[in-house]
């Protein structure tokens, strides 16, 4: 399955929530303007149907998959890893998604969206423990240091981050620490469920794959 490259606001409207796929609060503004209107030319005249249990589970799975920008095959693989890991399967799944390098780059404020973070990783701007890493799906470990390549810091994008002290205004989650001056973040621990998005009902995803 190819990665979705269409209008990202359409995905948020389909799920009925802001998936944070655009910078700032533009995604939320679209939802406020369009309300619960589904995407498509007939969206204004179509009411959202009452979903079956399966439909509710599917929508929750799709919502989380789209938040993190993960394809179905990879998402299913993460679920398989979660089922074989000690702990509640749903919470472990979310923890795995949070540990993706592109998500950590986003959480540290190097990028304003996960899609942009994925590009920064793909283009070789990000280092893990001092070594260039260009795999967005790489999972970080406790103690890993996430930085920006010295060569990349000379580029306009990162020079602007430094000159405007934008990273000084970033408040990363408690499981990450950030040295804005060095452009380095450290994975202090793995995130607990309480630190993750409370609007996600991961049990619905477990039920979906358990059918």
Curated annotation (Swiss-Prot):
GO terms for cellular component: small ribosomal subunit. One of its GO terms (biological process) is ribosomal small subunit biogenesis. Residues 27-48 are annotated as: Disordered. Residues 99-162 form the S4 RNA-binding domain. InterPro entries: Ribosomal_uS4, Ribosomal_uS4_bac-type, Ribosomal_uS4_CS, Ribosomal_uS4_N, S4_RNA-bd, S4_RNA-bd_sf. One of its GO terms (molecular function) is structural constituent of ribosome. Keywords: Ribonucleoprotein, Ribosomal protein, RNA-binding, rRNA-binding. It comes from the Bacteria. Gene3D superfamilies: Ribosomal Protein S4 Delta 41, Chain A, domain 1 (1.10.1050.10), RNA-binding S4 domain (3.10.290.10). The keyword Ribosomal protein applies. The keyword Transcription regulation does not apply. Belongs to the universal ribosomal protein uS4 family. Part of the 30S ribosomal subunit. Contacts protein S5. The interaction surface between S4 and S5 is involved in control of translational fidelity. One of the primary rRNA binding proteins, it binds directly to 16S rRNA where it nucleates assembly of the body of the 30S subunit. HAMAP family: Ribosomal_uS4_B. This is Small ribosomal subunit protein uS4. It comes from Herpetosiphon aurantiacus (strain ATCC 23779 / DSM 785 / 114-95). The gene is rpsD.
